[in-house]
């Protein structure tokens, strides 16, 4: 039976005032609330919330656990949430060992080279001589090139490869928020740039030059014209083209991180990449492939001119575009308002399971039972725990009709949760669970819950 990894402690309210475990299964997410000392009264409507702080408190006799399953509704996150995702995304990059960083950057360079090869062969296959019946206009040739090039970025994003141009934005944001050091930023930039160059060189030689694909006259002439044009710009013009290019690339990365599904990532990435291609902007890694392939094929350009009049200004322009026009602007924009609140709602499964807890350490929890008219009936307070008597994981190939652990019942209830991020970057979650007088039957695509032993200490160590 295939199962997802065990639950892990994900979000904590005010210095561990509420233990919330989270995991994912297909379209479902679930939180686990440990609320000892309380048995759910199914005859009345009530609202429960976790709050308080560590304290010694009398332990009641009947602890229980709520497992809340819900389907997330959000497809694209708001600007502040996307910014925080980028921040976390960048911090993870610094945790890569240098060999893995170089390998992933090498693969990104190969992806760019492969896409550049396909674009060159396809666009170059069309003649531009007006007398040729197969001739196409140069703007059409440029669009053909640009429409295919996003394949490289799709491969990079979906495989987690390291592309230097996107890293200029993410690492600067992390540095601005003091989540990485200047040394970590420099290692990431230099490692990804070196790996990208090696990958582009490998692709140009082994996947383009040695394959003989550049031997076609139309393709070779197209490649030669492209190489000559790229070193014919003035230094300042090439620099500004690099600024524009990486602005588009970093906006594409931003959109990809904000999107929650693969189809959305592909769609939001495609158009900015096509835009920089047809706009004539300069991308340092793409140029590494194109100009190196041109030199191998005999393009009438000198290697020193390539470095001085294209690689250097394009590199600096890409850094400025990614760091200043995107990274610094939005770091400045979102830093003062980093504290935010996000609320969502969903229908959820609730399993009441008890007793499951050790009775030694304690954490204060309060719950309020209310009548449908809002009148407070009873207030519950107390508990905690040191270890779980039975954690739960979701198993594949299961149905809700299957047996559920002892003293557990399943119902479908409205559920709201509120996620808050402080300016220090701490994330907290407040949950609201409304139990109506009459439970709703679970839907047909339910999930089976099976025991998984795990102590509170081992869970807390994963934060």
Curated annotation (Swiss-Prot):
What family is this?
Belongs to the FNT transporter (TC 1.A.16) family.
Reactions listed under catalytic activity:
(S)-lactate(in) + H(+)(in) = (S)-lactate(out) + H(+)(out); formate(in) + H(+)(in) = formate(out) + H(+)(out); pyruvate(out) + H(+)(out) = pyruvate(in) + H(+)(in); acetate(out) + H(+)(out) = acetate(in) + H(+)(in)
Compartments, record wording:
Cell membrane
- What is the membrane topology listed in the Swiss-Prot or TrEMBL record? Multi-pass membrane protein
GO terms (BP aspect): nitrite transport
Matching PANTHER family: FORMATE TRANSPORTER-RELATED (PTHR30520), FORMATE_NITRATE FAMILY TRANSPORTER (EUROFUNG) (PTHR30520:SF6)
Task: Specify the protein name.
Answer: Formate-nitrite transporter 2
List GO molecular-function terms, semicolon-separated.
Answer: high-affinity secondary active nitrite transmembrane transporter activity
Query: Which InterPro entries is this protein grouped with?
Result: Aquaporin-like (IPR023271), For/NO2_transpt (IPR000292), For/NO2_transpt_CS (IPR024002)
């Amino acid at each position: 039976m295939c199962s997802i990894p065990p639950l892990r402690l994900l979000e904590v309210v005010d210095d561990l005032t509420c233990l919330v475990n989270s995991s994912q299964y297909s379209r479902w997410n679930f939180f686990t609330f440990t609320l000892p000392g309380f048995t759910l009264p199914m005859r009345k409507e009530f609202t429960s919330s976790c709050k308080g702080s560590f304290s010694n408190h009398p332990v009641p006799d009947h602890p229980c656990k709520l497992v809340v399953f819900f389907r997330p509704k959000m497809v694209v996150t708001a600007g502040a949430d996307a910014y925080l995702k980028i921040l976390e995304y960048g911090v993870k990059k610094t945790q890569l060992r240098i060999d893995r960083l170089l390998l992933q950057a090498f693969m990104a360079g190969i992806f760019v080279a492969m896409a550049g090869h396909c674009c060159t062969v396809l666009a170059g296959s069309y003649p531009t001589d007006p007398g040729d019946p197969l001739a196409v206009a140069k703007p059409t040739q440029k669009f053909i090139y640009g429409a295919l090039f996003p394949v490289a970025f799709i491969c990079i994003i979906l495989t987690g490869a390291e592309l230097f141009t996107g890293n200029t934005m993410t690492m600067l944001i992390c540095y601005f928020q003091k989540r990485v050091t200047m040394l970590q930023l420099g290692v990431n930039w230099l490692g990804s740039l070196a790996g990208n160059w090696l990958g582009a060189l490998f692709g140009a030689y082994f996947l383009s030059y040695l394959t003989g694909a550049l031997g076609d006259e139309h393709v070779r002439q197209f490649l030669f014209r492209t190489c000559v044009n790229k070193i014919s710009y003035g230094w300042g013009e090439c620099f500004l083209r690099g600024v524009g290019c990486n602005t588009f690339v970093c906006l594409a990365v931003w959109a990809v991180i904000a999107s929650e599904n693969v189809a959305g990532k592909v769609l939001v990435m495609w158009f900015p990449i096509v835009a920089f291609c047809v706009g004539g902007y300069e991308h340092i890694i793409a140029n590494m492939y194109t100009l190196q392939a041109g030199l191998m094929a005999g393009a009438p350009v000198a290697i020193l001119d390539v470095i001085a009049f294209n690689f250097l200004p394009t590199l600096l322009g890409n850094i400025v575009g990614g760091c200043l026009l995107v990274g610094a602007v939005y770091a400045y924009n979102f830093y003062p308002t980093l504290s935010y609140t996000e609320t969502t709602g969903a229908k959820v499964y609730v399993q009441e399971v008890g007793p499951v807890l050790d009775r030694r350490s304690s954490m204060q929890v309060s719950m309020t039972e209310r009548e449908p008219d809002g009148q407070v009936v009873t207030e519950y307070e107390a508990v905690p725990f040191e270890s779980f008597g039975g954690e739960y994981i979701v198993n594949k190939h299961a149905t809700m009709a299957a047996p559920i652990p002892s003293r557990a019942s399943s119902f479908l209830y409205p559920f709201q949760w509120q996620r808050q991020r402080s300016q220090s970057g701490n994330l907290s979650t407040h949950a609201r669970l409304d139990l109506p007088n009459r439970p709703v039957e679970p839907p047909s695509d339910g999930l089976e819950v099976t025991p998984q032993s795990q102590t509170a200490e081992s869970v807390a160590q994963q934060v």
